[in-house]
Amino acid sequence: MTLSFDLTTEGARDALRARAAPEKPSLIGLTRAELGEALVASGIVPERQAKMRAQQLWHWMYVRGVSDFAGMFNISKDLRAELDKHFTVARPEIVEEQISSDGTRKWLFRFPPRGAGRPVEIETVYIPEEGRGTLCISSQVGCTLTCSFCHTGTQKLVRNLTTEEILAQLLTARDRLGDFPDRDTPDGAIVPAEGRKVSNIVMMGMGEPLYNFEAVKKALLIASDGDGLSLSKRRITLSTSGVVPEIFRTGEEIGVMLAISLHATNDDLRDLLVPINKKYPLKELIAACRAYPGLSNAKRITFEYVMLKDVNDSIEDAKGLIKLLKGIPAKINLIPFNPWPGTNYQCSDWETIEKFADYINNAGYASPIRTPRGRDILAACGQLKSESERMRKVDRLALEAMMIAGHGEA
């Protein structure tokens, strides 16, 4: 059974009115140094207190998960009022929450226009498994890559997400799952039996993370900060379709696990499936992978390979894959194609996928077949696409009018 909660009706008018007011800057997504600078620049904290106050706020935002200054009890009431006057730590609007029959959750978040002309929406997916819970995070509204098998690729790029908006997906998911101290897990929620509800994050949602490098870098460094959200970098994976110039920087400056959306073993086919290959062909991509900082058997690169019937699923393709990746510490994730409305592709037969996996395994590579999750709510790999077009026209126009009347499109 699939559950879907439309969260726009309750408080929708309040949300519209709130958007008419000038947008307060968020403290989410600032470094500690930037937090201190913002407090001093606002005139509410003297410079000598900036470092201490920044640390207090950091703890409340990222350890306790507080989304309202009123809940920061070790800060004076007067200072809390001043903070609320100048800044916000609020969560984004949740338009809809869908819960799959397998426990997968998908949220549709709405963010301010920030240059896009109207409010924007993105999707975030939570996948519970035995012993871990993985959050699939988006980095852009839409995508420029137009990978032919991917639903997100049919949505034009609207804009990059900010560091705040990337982190907001993680913070809100932890809110909804009861993953902060003194929070209750929702009744009936499927989550890991022990430990964190969100133990892993993957930058595999909407968009190409390396086309939004600085915001993604900052968000992941905050997410992995040991005095805050404290996610291990070994539990953070960044997936790229092959933006070669930024791959080395990812390892050097962020230090997280790397995944490559490969899907083909020759340039002719990859040009069709993943058009960025025309700019950065396989020879350059594989060379960048071999040079990835820290690459070892303990820090393998994951290569994602979607199984498309009669396209890339032959044993000859498997042989080509082994030859291409020879010498690279790697894991190869085989992804049964997840259908979406309007696609021309079909998923490979299960027997074909198993034979492909057996060949890869016998060649010495771990080759798990990814279990499709959340297909019934279009939350599976390659199915994400924000659905702003579902807003009733009258509501969308009213929302846009109030946004523009309040503070323009910035």
From Swiss-Prot:
Q: Which gene encodes it?
A: rlmN
Provide the cofactor list for this protein: [4Fe-4S] cluster
InterPro entries xref list: Aldolase_TIM, Methyltransferase_A, RlmN_N, RNA_MTrfase_RlmN, rRNA_lsu_MTrfase_RlmN/Cfr, rSAM
- Which reaction is catalysed here? adenosine(2503) in 23S rRNA + 2 reduced [2Fe-2S]-[ferredoxin] + 2 S-adenosyl-L-methionine = 2-methyladenosine(2503) in 23S rRNA + 5'-deoxyadenosine + L-methionine + 2 oxidized [2Fe-2S]-[ferredoxin] + S-adenosyl-L-homocysteine; adenosine(37) in tRNA + 2 reduced [2Fe-2S]-[ferredoxin] + 2 S-adenosyl-L-methionine = 2-methyladenosine(37) in tRNA + 5'-deoxyadenosine + L-methionine + 2 oxidized [2Fe-2S]-[ferredoxin] + S-adenosyl-L-homocysteine
Q: What is its main location?
A: cytoplasm
Q: Which HAMAP family match?
A: RNA_methyltr_RlmN
What organism is the protein native to? Mesorhizobium japonicum (strain LMG 29417 / CECT 9101 / MAFF 303099)
Describe its function. Specifically methylates position 2 of adenine 2503 in 23S rRNA and position 2 of adenine 37 in tRNAs. m2A2503 modification seems to play a crucial role in the proofreading step occurring at the peptidyl transferase center and thus would serve to optimize ribosomal fidelity.
Q: Which Pfam families match?
A: Radical_SAM, RlmN_N
- Assigned GO CC terms: cytoplasm
Q: How is the cofactor bound?
A: Binds 1 [4Fe-4S] cluster. The cluster is coordinated with 3 cysteines and an exchangeable S-adenosyl-L-methionine.
Q: Where is the active site?
A: E123, C381
Note the PANTHER family from the entry: 23S RRNA METHYLTRANSFERASE, RADICAL SAM CORE DOMAIN-CONTAINING PROTEIN
Cite the Radical SAM core domain residue spans from the record.
Answer: 129-378
Q: Which residues bind [4Fe-4S] cluster?
A: C143, C147, C150
Cite the EC number: 2.1.1.192
Q: Where in the cell is it found?
A: Cytoplasm
The protein depicted here goes by the name: Dual-specificity RNA methyltransferase RlmN
Q: Which family does it belong to?
A: Belongs to the radical SAM superfamily. RlmN family.
Q: Which cysteines are joined by disulfide bonds?
A: C136-C381
The alphabetized UniProt keywords are: 4Fe-4S, Cytoplasm, Disulfide bond, Iron, Iron-sulfur, Metal-binding, Methyltransferase, rRNA processing, S-adenosyl-L-methionine, Transferase, tRNA processing
Which positions does UniProt annotate for S-adenosyl-L-methionine binding?
G207, E208, S239, S261, L262, H263, N338
- GO terms classed as biological process: rRNA base methylation; tRNA methylation
